[in-house]
A protein has these predicted regions:
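Low-complexity, Ser/Thr/Pro/Gly-enriched N-terminal "stalk/linker" regions
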Residues: 2-81, 106-126
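A conserved hydrophobic secondary-structure block that centers on an alpha-helix together
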Residues: 129-207
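Solvent-exposed beta-strand/loop surfaces of large extracellular or lumenal domains
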Residues: 501-525, 544-550
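C-terminal beta-rich recognition modules with glycine/proline-rich loops and embedded aromatic residues
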Residues: 217, 301, 363, 367-375, ...
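Catalytic-core region of carbohydrate-active enzymes that cleave or remodel glycosidic bonds
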Residues: 284-311, 334-386, 397
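Well-ordered alpha-helical scaffold segments within catalytic/enzyme domains
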Residues: 26, 86-99, 148-163, 197-209, ...
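Hydrophobic core segments within long, regular secondary-structure runs in both alpha-
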Residues: 23, 30, 42, 86, ...
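Carbohydrate-binding/catalytic loop surfaces
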Residues: 55-75, 123-142, 192-204, 234-274, ...
Length: 659
């Protein structure tokens, strides 16, 4: 394992002004976000979407700013939806200037500034509804979470436009928080119930180089879970009142593992609690560990990543296997139909993976990042950009959903909007900032993590390395990297070899490269000149995937994967009772291009078996000695799982019986 010093080499963030995505697949998603999703979400935030849950988020800011009368409406964290929308707009403006959109964003920023209190405090719920209760319920009420998202928006808007208006607002907010929290006698010795402020403060430190912001992030992380417990202290001080009663009074205070506050981080051995909170927290910890060269926190990241990725990660890149607390369960407990796998959790997982890659050049993090992106993140949004999943099941039986309340969180189709609408704007900001995930630029090498078509310019010392990636992943196997620099540049390209590809082939200017990979990356060092070409052939045959024997939910079953994509069966192609379909171990696969909503996408077929019975409703519920079903041949059609539920309500499943 590399030492801390070796892994802490300088990492530069890609300037998204210098990167243009032209990928035939994911590029369409960026266009969809820019042209459809951002305007749609702006309408939703202003309550202009028919048959959708009201948001009132913009109205809350107007009320807090004194520009409108009324009462606060929505979740206690409603402000964060506006912040994430602003961040998505910022990254979108890097791709394509839009004067009208920028003007709208500027107006929102002025509204946010008008809602800020003189001392820097910014939160519409407490400003409008409970000004006397500021900073009295950190465990439950998301003040620092909302602050974190607004800080992220301020950083993004500054990086995207050079405008400092929102950056000044969030610096004033961060300065206020720094005055309230810390080790001083007159300060609160607390930390957020929902982590977010930690990763946001690290991003703010990146652009301001203000050491107080890094120190405050460190304080929040180090103080977490210590005794005497802050959540208990503040609970007593406010008269034992609680905001949430989902699982009984004060359940968030009592169940400290829910917020990863049951122990100091250094003592935690398992990924536990609310999945989004976990990955947001660890994103901040990983960023802090690298920049502060803190070996202890680095080891915390490695230990908890390993538990999550090796024992609690779904094949789809989803995390959080139970609806109770939107949380992790125990090792290897990965049910397919009652799973939660929140869209935000997979976005947070990508953020955590990105910071781990910056800390350690190991492709395992990029493999997970890619798995989350191409499956759960893309699956969280319909192909029209106007409907969204909060929860991402691996198996759905729509007929049971209205009657069995264990499935109350599961929806058979994507929704227009949510009362708790954290996921839609989160998906938008992730897709507009994809350029941050493609590369990890280090002083000694440019690491290419994702083979998404783009053109980029990367500073290398006093020179600039320009290159283009072209291809059509995840559908076709060939990726071409072309050097596009006017002057020769001596540098190293580190090419990720995906875990799903058993036999990658690489050529440089037509000559085969046979170098051994190190931790999943192939290193090519040379004097790069304009026109130099590296070609990767990443064969993507259809592969069967089997679960660890300890995952009881997939015993005797198999999943189908091609490239980074997980595939599933849908009722629209295969009829009802998908549980009665079997894929023989000897079956071969054929691929073909889809039509309609599946145009330009690769589908898969195989000859399978349906175990059916005549008029099963007329038969006994249980049979002695002989199964009532007869085996009949049936062609099985598999679609990319991220595309499911784009053709109406129907059954779906990833894991198929293997005969």
């Amino acid at each position: 394992m590399s030492s801390l010093k070796e892994s802490m080499m300088s990492v530069n963030e890609v300037d998204l002004h210098k990167l243009q995505i032209h990928d035939p697949f994911l590029g369409q998603y960026q266009h969809l976000v820019r042209d459809v999703v951002i305007p749609y979400q702006w309408a939703a935030l202003n309550d202009r979407v028919d048959d959708a849950e009201p948001s009132h988020a913009i109205a809350n800011f107007r009320i807090a700013a004194g520009q409108q009368t009324g009462e606060f409406y929505g979740m206690v964290f409603q402000d964060s939806d506006v912040a994430k929308w602003l961040e998505a707009v910022a990254w979108s403006l890097c791709q394509k200037p839009d004067a009208e959109l920028e003007k709208t964003a500027d107006e929102v920023i002025e509204l946010v500034a008008a809602a800020q209190c003189e001392d820097g405090y910014l939160n519409t719920y407490f400003t409008v509804k409970a000004p006397q209760d500021r900073w009295t319920n950190l465990a439950e009420c998301h003040e620092l979470y909302c602050a974190g998202h607004m800080i992220e928006a301020g950083v993004a808007f500054f990086q995207a436009t050079g405008k400092r208006r929102l950056l000044a607002v969030v610096c004033k907010l961060a300065d206020h928080i720094d005055s309230v929290f810390g080790p001083g006698e007159q300060q609160l010795h607390g930390y957020p119930g929902h982590p977010e402020i930690e990763l946001a403060l690290m991003r703010l430190y990146d652009v301001t180089q203000e050491p107080r912001y890094m120190a405050l992030a460190d304080y929040f992380i180090t103080q977490r879970g210590t005794q005497p417990h802050f959540y208990d202290d503040e609970y007593q001080k406010r008269g034992q009142t609680s905001y949430w009663h989902t699982y009984g009074p004060a359940w968030m205070i009592k169940d400290k593992a829910y917020s990863q506050a049951h122990q100091p981080l250094a003592e935690q051995q398992h990924a536990v609690g609310h999945a989004v909170r976990f990955v947001y927290l660890m994103t901040g910890v990983a960023h802090l560990a690298r920049l502060s060269q803190d070996e202890s926190k680095r080891q915390d990241c490695l230990r908890l990543w390993h538990n999550m990725a090796q024992r609690q990660l779904y094949i789809t890149g989803g995390i959080g296997s139970q609806s109770s607390g939107e949380a992790f369960s125990s090792d290897y407990d990965l049910p397919n139909d009652t799973v939660y796998a929140e869209s935000c959790a997979s976005i947070g997982l990508m953020m955590f993976a990105r910071r781990m890659l910056e800390m350690e050049a190991d492709s395992q993090y990029a493999d997970v990042m890619e798995r989350a992106l191409y499956n759960t993140v893309l699956g969280g949004m319909a192909l029209d950009g106007k409907h969204f999943f909060y929860v991402n099941p691996l198996e759905v039986h729509p007929k049971s959903l209205p009657f069995n309340h264990i499935y109350d969180h599961v929806k058979p189709v994507r929704q227009r909007w949510f009362g708790c609408a954290c996921c839609p704007p989160n998906i938008a900001r992730l897709l507009t900032s994809l350029g941050h995930y493609i590369y990890t630029p280090r002083e000694d090498a440019l690491f290419i993590n994702l083979y998404i078509g783009n053109r980029v310019e990367i500073p290398v010392g006093n020179q600039t390395l320009g290159l283009r990636i072209s291809g059509n992943l995840p559908w076709q196997e060939t990726v071409t990297i072309t050097i596009d620099s006017t002057q020769p540049v001596n540098h190293t390209l580190a090419l990720r070899l995906p875990d799903w590809c058993a036999s990658p082939q690489i050529t440089c200017n037509g000559t085969e490269v046979n170098e051994a990979a190190r931790k999943g990356y192939l290193y090519l060092t040379r004097h790069w000149q304009e026109g130099d070409t590296v070609t990767l052939t990443l064969p993507m045959p259809v592969r069967r995937v089997y679960g660890n024997p300890l995952v009881r939910h997939v015993a005797g079953k198999v999943a189908v994967q091609r490239g980074p994509l997980i595939y599933c069966l849908e009722q629209a192609d295969n009829g009802e009772q998908l549980h009665n379909l079997w894929l023989p171990a000897s079956a071969t696969f054929r691929t073909f291009e889809g039509k309609g909503v599946f145009a330009h996408k690769v589908l898969i077929q195989a000859e399978g078996i349906r175990k059916a019975a005549r008029e099963p409703e007329q038969q006994l519920l249980w049979h002695y000695d002989q199964a009532p079903a007869l085996a009949q041949p049936q062609t099985l059609t598999f679609i990319p799982w991220f595309c499911w539920a784009n053709r109406g309500v129907g059954e779906m499943r990833i894991w198929v019986n293997e005969a």
